[in-house]
């Protein structure tokens, strides 16, 4: 199964659980808090997306490229040794399955969205593409599809993230992208996003902004989710083939939240399926050096949308911290804030140390080196597994591979490469 028509455009009578309202809001979250100059571009983008999903030629091209270029569908893999590890003492605990988004072309889920938005940009006649990136995976995916379609590509990346993710910086440059360092603030993802938005305001007539997460102004949270919904659609079918029913638990890391929403979306209305997002607790939530936005955040506006944000007592957005560049963000997608508020999804946070330990464990037990972002989801198994019985089935979104993080992990462990 690849790239089927997203639920968003199949039925005008969908419940509020599966789509934003006419104002682009999930409950009170979302909206369009942007300069007037961007409103026409956002309207154009939403209209182009609606028309594209109804166009059989667009769907055919997207599905063909998802299959032959990206490599979908990605497998659902039974992690038998990881399952045994958590069952060894108590003989209870879930059977663990991995949705292998790390096997996509470019090594992460990000290309699902980058490919779809590139096709929309071409449809709108936009030949200049900009994007923000933290861990570099969205930047690499965007540079990849721009190379595929012959589009100009500019990537904004915080200087600190460029240091942490030097391999991905070179990959982007090798693919023909111009990588522009951002030195403001903490020189990480929030600052790169702000710089990309400034570029877009200036060049809105000729430029499409391929936003990399389910954040930002409407229609981006909906659009990015819908391009990633293939993850959950495939998972639902694969689970039925593997064990005859839907899983009991879905587990995914959450920064902005695109990989999690891609997995969750097809299951949102099935209340029998628990959905758990795992944020970055950094040095520990109690230290103030973390990126646990849903756990510790308050309602505010950042990058064009109302959502939960890390803020100080005066309402100023605080700096986030995580060893994972892809989770190092003080906001979260508005749909996640909504799902948390209505009690449909659960959210937890794990520390840098816990994520590093989980990365090592999964590598040694399954021969799969997950990205540091993904390792946060794996780390939560330590707390989750003892609470589940042996008949439970859990699916973890293995959102990316860890090649890009080897230097960071080695440095953290005191090893030299």
Swiss-Prot record:
CDD domains for the chain: Trp-synth_B
Top-level taxon of origin: Bacteria
A molecular function (GO) term: tryptophan synthase activity
Known pathway: Amino-acid biosynthesis; L-tryptophan biosynthesis; L-tryptophan from chorismate: step 5/5
Keyword Calcium: no
Residue ranges of coiled coil: none
Catalytic activity from the UniProt record: (1S,2R)-1-C-(indol-3-yl)glycerol 3-phosphate + L-serine = D-glyceraldehyde 3-phosphate + L-tryptophan + H2O
Subunit and interaction comment: Tetramer of two alpha and two beta chains.
Known role: The beta subunit is responsible for the synthesis of L-tryptophan from indole and L-serine.
Membership in a protein family: Belongs to the TrpB family.
Protein name: Tryptophan synthase beta chain
Species lineage: Bacteria, Bacillati, Cyanobacteriota, Cyanophyceae, Synechococcales
Gene: trpB
């Amino acid at each position: 199964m690849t790239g089927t028509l997203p639920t968003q455009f199949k039925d005008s009578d969908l419940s509020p659980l599966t789509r934003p309202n006419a104002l682009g809001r999930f409950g009170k979250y979302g909206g369009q808090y942007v300069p007037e100059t961007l409103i026409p571009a956002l309207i154009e983008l939403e209209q182009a997306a609606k028309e594209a999903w109804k166009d059989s030629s667009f769907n055919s091209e997207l599905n063909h490229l998802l299959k032959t270029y990206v490599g979908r569908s990605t497998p659902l893999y039974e992690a038998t040794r990881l399952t045994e590890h958590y069952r060894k003492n108590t003989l209870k605990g879930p059977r663990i399955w991995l949705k292998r988004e790390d096997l996509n072309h470019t090594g992460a889920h990000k290309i699902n969205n980058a490919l779809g938005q590139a096709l929309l940009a071409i449809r709108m006649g936009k030949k200049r593409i900009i994007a923000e990136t933290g861990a570099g995976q969205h930047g690499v995916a965007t540079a990849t599809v721009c190379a595929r379609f012959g589009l100009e590509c500019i990537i904004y990346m915080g200087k600190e993230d460029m240091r942490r993710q030097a391999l991905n910086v070179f990959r982007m440059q090798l693919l023909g992208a111009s990588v522009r360092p951002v030195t403001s603030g903490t020189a990480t993802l929030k600052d790169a996003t702000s710089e990309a938005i400034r570029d877009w305001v200036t060049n809105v007539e000729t430029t499409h902004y391929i936003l990399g997460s389910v954040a930002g102004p409407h229609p981006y949270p909906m659009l990015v989710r819908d391009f990633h919904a293939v993850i959950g659609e495939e998972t639902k079918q694969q689970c039925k083939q593997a064990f005859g029913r839907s899983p009991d638990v879905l587990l995914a890391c959450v920064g902005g939240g695109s990989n999690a929403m891609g997995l969750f979306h097809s299951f949102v209305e099935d209340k029998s399926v628990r959905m758990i997002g795992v944020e970055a607790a950094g040095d520990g939530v109690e230290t103030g050096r973390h990126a646990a936005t849903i756990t510790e955040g308050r309602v505010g506006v950042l990058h064009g949308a109302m959502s939960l944000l890390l803020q100080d007592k005066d309402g100023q957005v605080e700096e986030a911290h995580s060893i994972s560049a892809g989770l190092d963000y003080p906001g979260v997608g508005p749909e996640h804030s909504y799902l948390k508020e209505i009690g449909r999804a659960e959210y937890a946070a794990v520390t840098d140390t816990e994520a590093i330990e989980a990365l090592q464990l999964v590598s040694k037990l399954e021969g799969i080196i997950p990205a540091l972002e993904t390792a946060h989801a794996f780390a939560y198994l330590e707390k989750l597994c003892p609470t589940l019985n042996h008949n439970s089935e859990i699916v973890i979104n293995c959102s990316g591979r860890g090649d890009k993080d080897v230097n960071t992990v080695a440095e953290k462990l005191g090893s030299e490469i």
